[in-house]
């Protein structure tokens, strides 16, 4: 079983590092980006199995990245967890409206994020048959 490849995109480098360390402890491969434009480019190039996106980022916010991912056939099925300080009901609704699979607000518990990733990975099916990941 291949390890899960996860894109983490947030403009706060210490948050990216915190997430990266916790995901890599699970044996997963982590690709990082620090703004929305770079995140979108890395999704297209790296083809991750899952994305963790902040909302408030330079150049392109996380909602714009999410909307773009959902419009493109190559990326429309990639699961997305929004991880953001935007915690009002309207923000959460907007995230789900644009196609987020889960919405986690900051401050967050890194192990809760790990749990979300496991839950999504276990239920993800891209139509090519059963997909299994080594979840550690």
PLM features: what roles do these ranges have?
Residues 17-25:
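Charged docking surfaces used in two-component/phosphorelay signaling
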Residues 46-52:
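Active-site beta3 strand of CheY-like receiver
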Residues 57:
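Receiver (REC) domain active-site loop signature in two-component systems and cognate sites
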Residues 108-118:
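C-terminal output helix
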């Amino acid at each position: 079983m291949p390890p899960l490849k996860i894109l983490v995109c947030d403009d706060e480098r210490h948050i990216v590092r915190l997430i990266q360390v916790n995901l890599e402890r699970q044996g997963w491969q982590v690709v990082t980006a620090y703004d929305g434009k770079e995140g979108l480019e890395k999704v297209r190039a790296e083809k991750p199995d899952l994305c963790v996106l902040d909302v408030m980022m330079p150049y392109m916010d996380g909602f714009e990245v999410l909307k773009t991912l959902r419009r493109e056939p190559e990326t429309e099925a990639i699961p997305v967890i929004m991880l953001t300080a935007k915690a009002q009901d309207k923000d959460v609704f907007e995230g789900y409206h644009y196609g987020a699979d889960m919405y986690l607000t900051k401050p967050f518990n890194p192990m809760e994020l790990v749990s979300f990733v496991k839950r999504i990975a276990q239920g993800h099916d891209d139509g090519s048959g059963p997909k299994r990941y080594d979840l550690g």
